[in-house]
Amino acid sequence: MAVAPPGMDRVTTAMCGTCANEGAYKVAILTYANNKRGVDVPPTELELCSCMSNQAPGSPDYAIMSLKSGFHGRLLGALSTSRTRTSYKVDIPAFDWPAA
């Protein structure tokens, strides 16, 4: 792609802005996890088993920081980073992620 920054040669499409944010969160978290573990190192048996119960170490306690007045979407991950309207968030479980 002629307009892509150097070293970025792939495109990921999404159906909406929320989906794009959810995808970006996932890519960022997986990139961090791969760099921490080692790119060619597979998950341990404990990580594989514990992730099915949403427990560490397979489901680590990572966080996404957002802005206090930002709107990032209405799906669970994106809604956890949105902080614009109470009507979007009330009665919906959310990740305990920080805001700046």
Language model segments and positions:
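PLP-dependent aspartate aminotransferase-fold enzymes
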Residues: 1-100
